[in-house]
Amino acid sequence: QAKVEMLDNLLDIEVAYSLLKGGAEDNKKDPIDINYEKLKTKIEVVDKTTKEAEIILQYVKNTHAATHNTYTLVVEEIFKIVREGEYQKYRPFQDLPNRQLLWHGSRATNYAGILSQGLRIAPPEAPVTGYMFGK
């Protein structure tokens, strides 16, 4: 199990490294801007006074289990993520009424891959640590 977890971590690091490495770069651009563009993702901060933010904050409050009483949750920022090409995939379903907010926690090494390639279903051999609601 430990070896599978190590391989999973290495794969996440490889994805992040491949994004950072990239190809020929424009030396006039800021490296942060170059790497942000490689994600092919638009990231916006959501104003906490909006209805969208209020719903998310209420969900956080409602899903903080009574068994997790040794800490309190504080939402520091809320981000809206728009991945390139995702809207076209979503468009045929946008008028359906059955929507759900889903929570996803992940290691920092996973975020470059999640943002650039989307969230993928964990393979059966992946470690189960941290799955509060199952896989």
Curated annotation (Swiss-Prot):
Catalytic residues identified in the record: 135
Keyword NAD among UniProt keywords: yes
Post-translational modifications reported in the UniProt record: Poly-ADP-ribosylated on serine, glutamate and aspartate residues by autocatalysis. Auto-ADP-ribosylation on serine takes place following interaction with HPF1. Auto poly-ADP-ribosylation on serine residues promotes its dissociation from chromatin.
All residue ranges annotated as the PARP catalytic domain in the record: 30-135
EC number in record: 2.4.2.30, 2.4.2.-
Superkingdom, natural source: Eukaryota
Pfam families membership: PARP
Subcellular location: Chromosome; Nucleus; Nucleus, Nucleolus; Cytoplasm, Cytosol
Regulation of activity: ADP-ribosyltransferase activity is regulated via an allosteric activation mechanism. In absence of activation signal, parp1 is autoinhibited by the PARP alpha-helical domain (also named HD region), which prevents effective NAD(+)-binding. Activity is highly stimulated by signals, such as DNA strand breaks. Binding to damaged DNA unfolds the PARP alpha-helical domain, relieving autoinhibition.
Keywords: ADP-ribosylation, Allosteric enzyme, Chromosome, Cytoplasm, DNA damage, DNA repair, DNA-binding, Glycosyltransferase, Immunity, Innate immunity, Isopeptide bond, NAD, Nucleotidyltransferase, Nucleus, Repeat, Transcription, Transcription regulation, Transferase
Annotated positions binding NAD(+): 104-106, 113, 120
Span of domain PARP alpha-helical: 1-21
GO cellular component: chromatin; cytosol; nuclear replication fork; nucleolus; site of double-strand break
Catalytically driven reaction(s): NAD(+) + (ADP-D-ribosyl)n-acceptor = nicotinamide + (ADP-D-ribosyl)n+1-acceptor + H(+); L-seryl-[protein] + NAD(+) = O-(ADP-D-ribosyl)-L-seryl-[protein] + nicotinamide + H(+); L-aspartyl-[protein] + NAD(+) = 4-O-(ADP-D-ribosyl)-L-aspartyl-[protein] + nicotinamide; L-glutamyl-[protein] + NAD(+) = 5-O-(ADP-D-ribosyl)-L-glutamyl-[protein] + nicotinamide
Similarity remark: Belongs to the ARTD/PARP family.
Description of how the protein assembles with itself and partners: Homodimer; PARP-type zinc-fingers from separate parp1 molecules form a dimer module that specifically recognizes DNA strand breaks.
Role this protein plays: Poly-ADP-ribosyltransferase that mediates poly-ADP-ribosylation of proteins and plays a key role in DNA repair. Mediates glutamate, aspartate, serine, histidine or tyrosine ADP-ribosylation of proteins: the ADP-D-ribosyl group of NAD(+) is transferred to the acceptor carboxyl group of target residues and further ADP-ribosyl groups are transferred to the 2'-position of the terminal adenosine moiety, building up a polymer with an average chain length of 20-30 units. Serine ADP-ribosylation of proteins constitutes the primary form of ADP-ribosylation of proteins in response to DNA damage.
Domain comment (free text): The two PARP-type zinc-fingers (also named Zn1 and Zn2) specifically recognize DNA strand breaks: PARP-type zinc-finger 1 binds PARP-type zinc-finger 2 from a separate parp1 molecule to form a dimeric module that specifically recognizes DNA strand breaks. The PADR1-type (also named Zn3) zinc-finger mediates an interdomain contact and is required for the ability of parp1 to regulate chromatin structure.
Protein name: Poly [ADP-ribose] polymerase 1
Biological source species: Oncorhynchus masou (Cherry salmon)
